[in-house]
Amino acid sequence: PQAEYTFALDENEKTLTLSNDAFFGHYAGTSTYKIESLTDDALYLSCASKVESGNKWWYRFIPKEKNVKPVVPVKAVALAENFEKEKLSVDFKREEMGTLQHIYANPAPVPVNESKLVYLYQKTSAFYSNISYTVTGYKFDLTEMNKVRMKVYIPSYNNYEDVFATAGDWVTINKLQSQVAVKLQNSNLGTTSYTTQTEIVKANLQKDRWLELEFDFSSVKDRKDYDKIVIQFGGEGHAAPGIFFFDDFSFNK
């Protein structure tokens, strides 16, 4: 690259030409760009590619001081799902889960959960099976609304004794666990959202009966970056499969 570049403006043709064969962004074999529009907020340019026949490129430039990320509001919005209706209000995303129908008949319709339908969670041999729900357009206001509650059922027929493969030497647990974890994450971080997560694990849960659990995230009530709830049964990092059930999910005060 050159130490510096200049440009020439043709007001009649409404074009802008860069010096020294310079180009904006994607190389299109030209240094001349047509000015489509110019305002105080944005400059729009275009060019016909000379190296990709039939292609045309558009460019948008805005003042540096205006190139800021939009502010994402923080809201206290309650979430609840009992899985009884055909259209779910909280429809969990399934990651590396099994193929069994996830809305399932209650395996034990007795107190404390006599409802007709529940959620069947089928952990596969994948190391990081999980389900998650991400809200759109806002982040969680955890000031008061910081409790996740659900009813869970841990079947005894799962194989909790055998040793299974793990994701690596750093994984110390290689058996299926009678547990459930709930995590709050920042979805903006994508595949690295676990790096800033807050996780609560309920371990060594009693089997073959419905249990009412509460996950209290009041310790991170000042966080403003979370917008994703992850639920994970049986532990992670190992290939042990298992089936679990939960119902009456809520995120509230």
Which residues fall in each region the model found?
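Beta-rich carbohydrate-recognition modules and glycan-binding surfaces
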Residues: N55-K56, R60-K253
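Lipid interaction determinants
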Residues: P1-T6, D10-A76, D225
